[in-house]
């Protein structure tokens, strides 16, 4: 049985990202949509895992290449926030790591501003689909942290319609 994926509108996503060049919302959405991170990975992401020189995010199970938009956002956030807390996504108010519920709420508000009825997992799935459109299964398995067999089972059907 195939999966159904709820995909965001690319133009709407780009407008949202343009409005949030380096805010927590901008970082959260870029990490999910452009880098394929899950909410828990976003919550736990620390500055020592962001390799600006190597242009990658080093997660425990994989390295994800930094997209230029994400790199620019994170560089600005690093200047503003890195000395306050080792976590990449912190609350602008409390200056403490943002809990998962707050990450979901901020992303939901930003996505709603453009009528996008998607969530962070949908953005991660869209990342995987876009990667599969331009890369082979082993590469996508490496950057997504998913097994090739899992990718094939879940995403093969949707590639027929992209």
PLM regions with names:
Residues 50-52, 117, 136-156:
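Short, polar N-cap/turn motifs at the start of nucleic acid-interacting alpha helices
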Residues 6-39:
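Basic, Lys/Arg- and aromatic-enriched nucleic-acid-binding interface segment
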Residues 1-13, 60-69, 82-86:
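DNA breakage-rejoining catalytic core of tyrosine-based enzymes
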Residues 161-162:
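Conserved small/polar residues in nucleotide/adenosyl-binding loops
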Residues 28-29, 40-45, 140:
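Alpha-helix N-cap/helix-start motif at helix boundaries, enriched for small hydrophobics
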Residues 35, 40, 44-74:
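Conserved tyrosine-mediated DNA breakage-rejoining catalytic core shared by Y-recombinases
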Residues 104-144:
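Short, basic (Lys/Arg/His-rich) helix/loop patches that form interaction surfaces
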Residues 67-116:
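Active-site/catalytic core of tyrosine-dependent DNA strand-transfer enzymes
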